[in-house]
Amino acid sequence: MINSRRAIVAAVFILTVFFLLSRSHQSAPSVPVAKDAAAADTSKAAPASNPDPVSPPPEKPKEMEVKQRRTRPRIDMSGMSTYEKLAYAYPYDVETKFPAYIWQTWKQSPDQADFQFKDQHASWTDEHVGFVHEVITDDVAINLIRLLYATVPEVIDAYRSLHLPVLRADFFRYLILYARGGIYTDIDTYAIQSSVKWLPEKIPRETIGLVIGIEADPDRPDWAQWYSRRIQFCQWTIQSKPGHPVLREIITRITKQTLSMKRQGKLEKLLDHDVVEFTGPAVWTDAIMEYFNDERFFDLSRSKGVIDYKNFTGMETSKRVGDVVVLPITSFSPGVGQMGAKEPDDPMAFVKHDFEGTWKPESERHMGEQKEDGGEQQQQQQQQAPAQ
């Protein structure tokens, strides 16, 4: 009898233990655990016949992904100068590629019926397959500047304060190239050759950050009657990488001068003929020449002297100065019939400019007109501006 009772007790004990173990195993998944969701899905999808548990993926790749998404730390920029803010916002890396952007500005967009530069616009698209080609209207331009220069509010203030369209157009080209890089070109220009051919093959692209051309090389005693500088670099076509110091300098200069004249009540008094010195090729040329002689960027101890117009007058092929390539007058002004410029079919001809100058009075639109023989005759450029 005793043995029978012992057997019954033992059986009940074994069944109780089995029941408790079974409940514990079934309730385990409801406990919150720190497992990767992807690993949980993989475990559920595993075949029932596989006794080996599926291990969760390692955490290291996840940490690497977080590191790649990190941005530059925000810092207090209130004590910085405009130049320092610009340098922090868009640091310069000469080894990066030239961005595949083409920037232009006009009152209408190319898809509008009254857009009058369809042939010129198409030439840039045709010669630069795969490039992003944007024609920025005035309304888009101000919003773009607000976005790109949110950390440098004085730049936005200066841009909005400029009352003449040509002043804003000049300023915009520097601003968009500094922030995004690529090519800026006036709406009345034709692309003769792709920009991939602008630099000689012997020059490594990772060593150049700015490509410019000569606008004027007036080798004559009375040059100052016709041009602002003895050598004048054009700014109707510019190629650059983001953050280039020349662009940083000219943006700083225009911003300071604009806001200073605004405070003095002189800004509204600027006239069309002041544009060249304020935002145009004169101040652009000055910024470039100063860059060539700046000890912050060049080892002047190895220089043979000051770099000035003498280094560029009469040149017929490209010339490199540090990270800048200067193209001869034929490259961006072919066919003007003066100052050594050759025809548009010359191998060094890259861009043809119609010299539309729609912001100027009609009497001033053709920059190539110059008097000869004491002013009795005038020589006009071969290319004529489209009818206005």
Question: What is each model feature region?
Answer:
Residues 1-169, 185-388:
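Glycosyltransferase-associated regions of secretory-pathway enzymes
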Residues 170-182:
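Small-residue hinge/turn detector
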